[in-house]
């Protein structure tokens, strides 16, 4: 508890610096602006969104989560003794094999909030997910395809969608800024994608691992790690997702992005950044819903816009 209070005070100082920078830079959009105005978050799809070439994939609601996710969400947390430590993540997401618990939530022995979700995806390949992560963050409407109920806003540090690059290089080394509901709480997140091979993952041909640091769009603070491993199975692929939260570290402030985030309106206070079991449980459901929803039409989206 004392450590959490110390971290909360440290985040407060970081937040103050970020917000001060936001005021100085003046890059703040109106939180209640029209949906198609720059730097605006909004629910659902705007009339302009409906004119985009991928509009036929826009659903009014997110598809339900798979049954194993529903069962885990309704059940108790996984005991700490059964949760791999973050240091074992590379072994947990090995190129072959499986883990005793592939879908669940809980807290590690060292206090990290942990989430695991396995999603079976007929007709989907790892290459489709590498393409998706390089394609979706440049427009909020694309991001909303993933979870139309909860996703409100997306932007990318460097738009590489038109660059002559392999799909993985469009997002690795890049930062995605998103506003989304995870459970009842509106989060403003900065997700910095990193090279999985450089971080010790085995990524054979036909597989991928999407690996990144999860941080705040407002405060210069990272709060955890995420990894999505995609492996082929008969008829499609499986995604094995892992989240470890309450892994705090400071990062270089981005005052312009902080100003933009503040300008989009209120969200979860970065001073209350610690993830409890309820937050982990909500993230389990959110991940299960969005991965299952997008997988239903990702092959068609990929063939049309790759």
Could you tell me what each predicted segment is?
Residues 122-141:
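Amphipathic alpha-helical segments
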Residues 36-109, 231-306:
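Terminal "cap-and-tail" regions of soluble proteins that handle hydrophobic small molecules
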Residues 123, 200-205, 229-238:
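A short, structured loop/turn motif at beta-sheet edges
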Residues 107-128:
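Terminal, regulation- and interaction-focused segments at domain boundaries
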Residues 114-116, 221-227:
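Short, surface-exposed coil-to-beta transition loops
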Residues 1-7, 18-23:
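N-terminal secretory signal peptides
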């Amino acid at each position: 508890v004392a450590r959490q209070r110390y971290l909360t005070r440290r985040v407060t100082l970081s937040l103050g610096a970020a917000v001060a920078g936001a005021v100085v830079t003046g890059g703040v959009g109106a939180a209640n602006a029209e949906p198609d105005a720059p730097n605006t978050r909004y629910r659902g799809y705007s009339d302009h969104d409906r004119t985009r070439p991928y509009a036929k994939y826009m659903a009014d609601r997110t598809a339900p989560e798979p049954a194993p996710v529903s069962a885990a969400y309704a059940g108790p947390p996984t005991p700490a003794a059964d949760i791999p430590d973050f240091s074992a993540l590379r072994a947990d997401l090995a190129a072959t094999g499986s883990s005793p618990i592939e879908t669940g939530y809980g807290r590690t022995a060292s206090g990290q909030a942990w989430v695991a979700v396995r999603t079976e995806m007929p007709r989907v390949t790892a290459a489709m997910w590498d393409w998706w992560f390089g394609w979706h963050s440049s427009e909020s409407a694309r991001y909303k395809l993933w979870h139309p109920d909860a996703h409100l806003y997306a932007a990318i540090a460097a738009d590489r969608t038109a660059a002559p690059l392999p799909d993985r290089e469009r997002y690795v080394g890049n930062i995605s800024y998103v506003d989304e509901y995870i459970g009842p709480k509106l989060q403003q997140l900065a997700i910095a994608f990193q090279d999985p091979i450089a971080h010790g993952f085995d990524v054979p041909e036909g597989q991928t691992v999407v690996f990144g640091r999860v941080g705040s769009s407002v405060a210069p603070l990272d709060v955890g790690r995420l990894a999505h491993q995609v492996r082929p199975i008969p008829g499609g692929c499986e995604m094995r997702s892992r989240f470890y939260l309450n892994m705090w570290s400071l990062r270089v402030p981005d005052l312009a992005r902080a100003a933009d985030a503040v300008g989009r309106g209120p969200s979860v206070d970065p001073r209350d950044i610690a993830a409890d079991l309820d937050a982990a449980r909500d993230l389990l459901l959110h991940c299960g819903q969005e991965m299952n929803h997008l997988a239903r039409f990702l092959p068609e989206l990929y063939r049309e816009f790759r």
